[in-house]
Amino acid sequence: MPAGLPGQASVAVRLSCDVPPDARHHEPRPGMTDHPDTGNGIGLTGRPPRAIPDPAPRSSHGPAKVIAMCNQKGGVGKTTSTINLGAALGEYGRRVLLVDMDPQGALSAGLGVPHYELDKTIHNVLVEPRVSIDDVLIHSRVKNMDLVPSNIDLSAAEIQLVNEVGREQTLARALYPVLDRYDYVLIDCQPSLGLLTVNGLACTDGVIIPTECEFFSLRGLALLTDTVDKVRDRLNPKLDISGILITRYDPRTVNSREVMARVVERFGDLVFDTVITRTVRFPETSVAGEPITTWAPKSAGALAYRALARELIDRFGM
């Protein structure tokens, strides 16, 4: 089980130095809360946000709840949310495993891992029976959070698996031996509805759908919910939508407010109270190779992902 990678620390240090020192760890603006409101106690979703206290520490760990972070539309903050939700869960004492199921390797890169240099990744786990999760596991620098990395090699997996018996359950079989070590497994699915994404959905307890507040996202949301229904009927009876996360929300625009209203009207309580607003902080964290919870721990983005973690723990009761 590799505890790190040659050159990883130096890459991370170099990336961190590329960002001006005064860009880090700004204090929050006066009046900033975990759930910004629009006045009269109404949150950005148009509903009064629930007050969820910090979760109690866990005396033991596992078996993990497996959650797919999924949206076939790219650029909705899916990978950013996977990293930062995982880091926030780790802050609350939950052990988290992140699984990068995107050949672009954005999740791995977002944690400062030079994924393009790796000899073994999730691709090897899926297509080589003798390679296990432990053979590719990386202990990240983030507290309580491990990573199963990916790179461009994964793009060949769909073709390599197409003739395999039980190909949709390949990831489930690989994850099963490690579930007792973790409280949450977050799978960062690629922005498509191909075999890799179906593998992610087929082994999960639920799916979180990050979606940005734009009208084009509404149609993608409908298509994805149809796919979830099909996977539930054919492959994974326990699959359900754990929540819909609104990202890149700008309360100043009519478009954002109208899309928010439509999503809440359609999906009701499935929409998380936590809303991720637009901020320059997230691109900075991608360059630094660390979550916003450590890069700018008092920023609005960090507070939001901690609030999301509390909501998720409350929904799953763990």
Curated annotation (Swiss-Prot):
Disruption phenotype: Essential for growth. Keywords: ATP-binding, Nucleotide-binding. Residues 19-63 are annotated as: Disordered. GO terms for molecular function: ATP binding. It comes from the Bacteria. Induction: Induced by albendazole and thiabendazole, which inhibit the GTPase activity of FtsZ and probably septum formation. ATP binds at Q72, K73, G74, G75, V76, G77, K78, T79. Pfam families: AAA_31. Gene3D superfamilies: P-loop containing nucleotide triphosphate hydrolases. One of its GO terms (cellular component) is bacterial nucleoid. PANTHER family: COBYRINIC ACID AC-DIAMIDE SYNTHASE, P-LOOP CONTAINING NUCLEOSIDE TRIPHOSPHATE HYDROLASE. May play a role in septum formation. Belongs to the ParA family. This is Uncharacterized protein Rv1708. It comes from Mycobacterium tuberculosis (strain ATCC 25618 / H37Rv).
